[in-house]
Amino acid sequence: MRLSPVLLRLSRGPALLALALPLAVALAFSDETLDKVPKSEGYCSRILRVQGTRREGYTEFSLRVEGDPDFYKPGTSYRVTLSAAPPSYFRGFTLIALKENREGDKEEDHAGTFQIIDEEETQFMSNCPVAVTESTPRRRTRIQVFWIAPPAGTGCVILKASIVQKRIIYFQDEGSLTKKLCEQDSTFDGVTDKPILDCCACGTAKYRLTFYGNWSEKTHPKDYPRRANHWSAIIGGSHSKNYVLWEYGGYASEGVKQVAELGSPVKMEEEIRQQSDEVLTVIKAKAQWPAWQPLNVRAAPSAEFSVDRTRHLMSFLTMMGPSPDWNVGLSAEDLCTKECGWVQKVVQDLIPWDAGTDSGVTYESPNKPTIPQEKIRPLTSLDHPQSPFYDPEGGSITQVARVVIERIARKGEQCNIVPDNVDDIVADLAPEEKDEDDTPETCIYSNWSPWSACSSSTCDKGKRMRQRMLKAQLDLSVPCPDTQDFQPCMGPGCSDEDGSTCTMSEWITWSPCSISCGTGTRSRERYVKQFPEDGSVCTLPTEETEKCTVNEECSPSSCLTTEWGEWDECSATCGMGMKKRHRMVKMSPADGSMCKAETSQAEKCMMPECHTIPCLLSLWSEWSDCSVTCGKGMRTRQRMLKSLAELGDCNEELEQVEKCMLPECPIDCELTEWSQWSECNKSCGKGHMIRTRMIQMEPQFGGTPCPETVQRKKCRIRKCLRNPSIQNLRWREARESRRSEQLREESDGDQFPGCRMRPWTAWSECTKLCGGGIQERYMTVKKRFKSSQFTSCKDKKEIRACNVHPC
């Protein structure tokens, strides 16, 4: 019996031959007579031949290149997916890329190279390294690899896949298992015009657009704008072919210009709404500040929209900020299929394009209007040496974003009779039974349990269920969704495949032989990755043991040891760890030498995969008000720790502080207290007294200006005599002075009861030569009487104005 080529890789050594044979039996390849297969006569030609019955007319398997391009760009990486629509599956596969009209029997027939994404799922064929096959033959519904397009001049390439489903049933190459891509030859790099066909689909379809920004300092390090990087609000619509929002080779409208230069969607939305007959839904989603952060992946901005037969195209755009006029988006993406149905899913990687309205070449170039306006075009790596995307070798620009458009509902009578997949079969299930994850960030759940068995026991549509536990509800005002989830399924009667199949991990490397001389044993282990879907017990072995021989003819220097003891427990509870075991020397070497046999061993051990939950943080709050109302201060913002990491501490920053600067604080004028009133400037008749105060601080930065510093008030001593002689006047003044002094001395006891005062000192010098100064004099206590209870007995001070004339 010859093994299927899918299984031949298992027979690469005598140790694996024993595994390959029972596995072939398990897959039932030996249940029917196999046709003889001729030996390979050329390079990799054997991988295109499989024994058994070939099936045709299948639609459940598909080979898809991400974005569904018809052309490839030389040297560009493309994600290739081979999938089976539920409830179908496949066990084995081969995938190759051939130049058009080549058979694959020569090395030069193959085009491009594949890159492995998941080594547990896929590997290169050992005897045909240009082809990809499965790592382990088991039930699967999807695999993915990268394909690197060949150099320029290769021409058209055909990707071909072969599917082994079960027993000896296989599908190969034709129809949906073949994808033809031709070398890009377009005016615009990376842009190919697709003719827009009339749509024949019925009813309407509802889609969700999700935008994943990938523009970051890590992916695009050259001149990355750290402070103000962002994506503007998404704006677009679902529309007919009679309306164009934007397109390569066209001119930007005023709305597109304002999005491209200012990040403002207002004018663009106004333009879209003016085309009400041609537009079904306006698409809007929030802006992203900053352009990249983990939240952009966990809770990427999204928007829902609808399409119908006449308005089956969708377009949108968003600005890269800061930039001169650079955007990303889709133009006239057709969601109607040739089979009169609605596209299930679209995934597109996006590169930036220039709106043709500003001639800047760097992220933060000053405004430089393009006059006359140029056509919209994709940016290339050869545009300008100062461009952040410049590459002297002309390589492709790394994608800056990805958009995913998924169909989430269909309404009305549908005219595509043949369903796309099981989801289409049960498209009319109630909304609560849809498999949509709308879990708020404030709800922390455990991992989902495995899916239950399908509710239908025959080949008919049914439902299956899974459950999870609500661990924490961080915000009681936000309700948490149900802890049960339902998914459409087809009963087991649709396939004669055993539903009790369980998924196993790869075998861990064989342990060392149990003895150092002679015949012993060695073992290896694996673990169950997924238990059977029908809930039965997995009966596949998790440990294998085989004999091993080391130095059949043991020399006199050999020593005799006990069997190895049991392995210690694995040092890890999940993931990769270490375990040890020991043995003892039973008999030393006959020649008296030291026993060189190992007495302890350590090896890696694999526990079930770790499922860790990183610490969950809230969004940053808005910056607080500045700590001051003017001048220099500080402001802060915070975020909350919603959930600790399942393993380890959360070391993320919870508070940020930065300086803030407000206009300088106004400084008001500052003055001293008023001085005491001066003596009247006349000895008789009407006069005036003054008092003054000093400026201590001049006003600054709009502070209150200084008020008056000198005040006057009238005073009147007594009436002056009319026309007295000067001599008589002086005599009278002298007499009055003597009389006043006598009265003062006589009244000292009454004016200052309880103490005797010294006379007033002389007036001090004026503090200013002009403009109003002050003078001071003092009277001090000479003697206090012991029996005095008066509080007026204290030192005195008088102040008067002087030199009040202007300077």
Curated annotation (Swiss-Prot):
Ca(2+) binds at residues 325, 354, 358. This is Spondin-1. Cell adhesion protein that promotes the attachment of spinal cord and sensory neuron cells and the outgrowth of neurites in vitro. May contribute to the growth and guidance of axons in both the spinal cord and the PNS. Major factor for vascular smooth muscle cell. Residues 442-495, 501-555, 558-611, 614-666, 668-721, 754-806 form the TSP type-1 domain. The keyword DNA repair does not apply. Residues 195-388 form the Spondin domain. GO terms for cellular component: extracellular matrix; extracellular region. It is found in: Secreted, Extracellular space, Extracellular matrix. Binds to the central extracellular domain of APP and inhibits beta-secretase cleavage of APP. One of its GO terms (molecular function) is LBD domain binding. It comes from Bos taurus (Bovine). Disulfide bonds join 44-128, 156-182, 199-336, 200-340, 202-415, 443-480, 454-489, 459-494, 502-538, 513-517, 548-554, 559-595, 570-574, 605-610, 615-650, 626-630, 660-665. Residues 29-194 form the Reelin domain. Residues 1-28 form the signal peptide. One of its GO terms (biological process) is positive regulation of protein processing. Glycans are attached at residues 214, 681. CDD domains: Reeler. PANTHER family: SPONDIN (PTHR11311), SPONDIN-1 (PTHR11311:SF16). InterPro entries: Reeler_dom, Reeler_sf, Spondin/Thrombospondin_T1, Spondin_N, Spondin_N_sf, TSP1_rpt, TSP1_rpt_sf, TSP1_spondin_dom.
